[in-house]
UniProtKB/Swiss-Prot annotation:
Role according to the record: Allows the formation of correctly charged Asn-tRNA(Asn) or Gln-tRNA(Gln) through the transamidation of misacylated Asp-tRNA(Asn) or Glu-tRNA(Gln) in organisms which lack either or both of asparaginyl-tRNA or glutaminyl-tRNA synthetases. The reaction takes place in the presence of glutamine and ATP through an activated phospho-Asp-tRNA(Asn) or phospho-Glu-tRNA(Gln).
Superkingdom, taxonomy of origin: Bacteria
Family per record: Belongs to the GatC family.
A molecular-function term among this protein's GO annotations: glutaminyl-tRNA synthase (glutamine-hydrolyzing) activity
Assembly and oligomerization: Heterotrimer of A, B and C subunits.
Swiss-Prot/TrEMBL catalytic activity: L-glutamyl-tRNA(Gln) + L-glutamine + ATP + H2O = L-glutaminyl-tRNA(Gln) + L-glutamate + ADP + phosphate + H(+); L-aspartyl-tRNA(Asn) + L-glutamine + ATP + H2O = L-asparaginyl-tRNA(Asn) + L-glutamate + ADP + phosphate + 2 H(+)
Keyword Nucleotide-binding: yes
Cited HAMAP family: GatC
Protein name, as recorded: Aspartyl/glutamyl-tRNA(Asn/Gln) amidotransferase subunit C
SUPFAM superfamilies, per database record: Glu-tRNAGln amidotransferase C subunit
Database matches in Pfam families: GatC (PF02686)
Keyword Ribosomal protein attached: no
Length: 98
């Protein structure tokens, strides 16, 4: 497993525009090293015969069929509106003539 060096952490911090003290750089390189060790252990445990997945269980669509139901006519919809004009809803302007 490749080692995470302090210089690599410093380079990444610079790329991300993150200011880090010398102590933070040392701590972060050690923390990242531990994380990579754990990831490596998980990869080794999985083996080549395990199919990679994004979820531990299979997902399936649990939604109902998308079937159009009764719809309002244009007139029925506009009857409920406080104001309409030329077959469209009329609402107050909000952008001062833009």
């Amino acid at each position: 497993m490749p080692e995470i060096t302090r210089d690599q952490v410093e380079h990444l911090a610079r790329l991300a525009h993150i200011r880090m003290t010398d102590e933070e750089l040392d701590t972060m390189s050690g923390d990242l090293e531990k994380i990579l060790e754990h990831v490596s252990a998980v990869q080794a445990a999985a083996g080549d015969d395990v199919t990679p997945t994004s979820h531990p269980i299979a997902l399936e669509n649990v939604f109902r069929e998308d079937v159009p139901a009764g719809m309002l006519t244009q007139e029925e919809a506009l009857d409920q509106a406080p104001d309409s004009e030329d077959g469209q809803f009329k609402v107050p302007a909000i952008l001062d003539g833009e």
